[in-house]
C-alpha cells in the first residue's frame, strides 16, 4: 500500500479512478516514456511504471510530496536514475527542461491551481509529446480548453475527478 497525504489540503487520485484511467491507457503505457508533472505521492506515475512504462519522470514543487514519493519508491524497491527520475521544479520550469518524446503526460495539479492552458501550450511549444502521445489532465471540473496543436478527444468522470484526454493534432 502506498503512502499518501492526510487531510484535505491535498487530493490524491482515488484508487478507483486511477485503475479506470490505466485500464483506458493500457495500450499506451507499456514501453512508454511518462511525465507525472504534479506527482504528489507518485501514485499515477507508479501505476504507469507497474504497467510497463520504460521511463517515468516524477515532478513536484512540494518537498512534502517528494518525501512521500521517495517513501513509496523505497517501499517498492524502485531506484532513481535511469528509468525513474525525480525532479523538484515548478511545472513551467519542469516542462522547460524536458526533451520531447513523451508517450504519456499526466497533469494532476492542485484544484486551486488553474494552470491548464499554460501547461498544455508549453507542451505543444516544446514538442514534448511523441507522435501518438497523450496528455491526461485531471481536475475537479471538465477542462474545456481548445489548444492549438492539441485535440481534446475524450473526457471521463470518476467521483469528483474529471480526466480530459488530449493528443497532438496532425498537420
List the model feature ranges, each with a label.
Residues 1-171:
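Class I S-adenosyl-L-methionine-dependent methyltransferase catalytic core
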Amino acid at each position: 500500500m502506498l503512502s499518501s497525504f492526510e487531510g484535505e489540503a491535498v487530493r490524491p487520485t482515488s484508487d478507483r479512478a486511477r485503475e479506470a484511467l490505466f485500464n483506458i491507457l493500457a495500450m499506451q503505457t507499456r514501453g512508454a516514456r511518462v511525465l507525472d508533472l504534479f506527482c504528489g505521492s507518485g501514485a499515477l506515475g507508479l501505476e504507469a511504471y507497474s504497467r510497463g512504462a520504460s521511463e517515468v519522470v516524477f515532478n513536484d514543487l512540494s518537498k512534502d510530496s517528494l518525501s512521500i514519493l521517495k517513501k513509496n519508491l523505497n517501499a517498492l524497491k524502485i531506484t532513481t536514475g535511469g528509468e525513474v527520475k525525480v525532479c523538484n521544479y515548478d511545472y513551467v520550469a519542469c516542462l522547460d527542461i524536458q526533451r520531447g518524446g513523451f508517450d504519456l503526460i499526466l497533469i494532476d495539479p492542485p484544484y486551486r491551481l488553474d494552470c491548464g492552458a499554460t501547461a498544455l501550450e508549453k507542451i505543444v511549444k516544446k514538442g514534448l509529446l511523441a507522435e501518438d502521445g497523450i496528455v491526461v489532465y485531471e481536475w475537479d471540473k471538465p477542462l474545456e480548453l481548445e489548444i492549438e496543436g492539441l485535440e481534446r478527444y475524450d473526457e471521463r468522470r470518476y467521483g469528483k475527478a474529471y480526466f480530459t484526454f488530449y493528443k497532438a493534432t496532425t498537420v
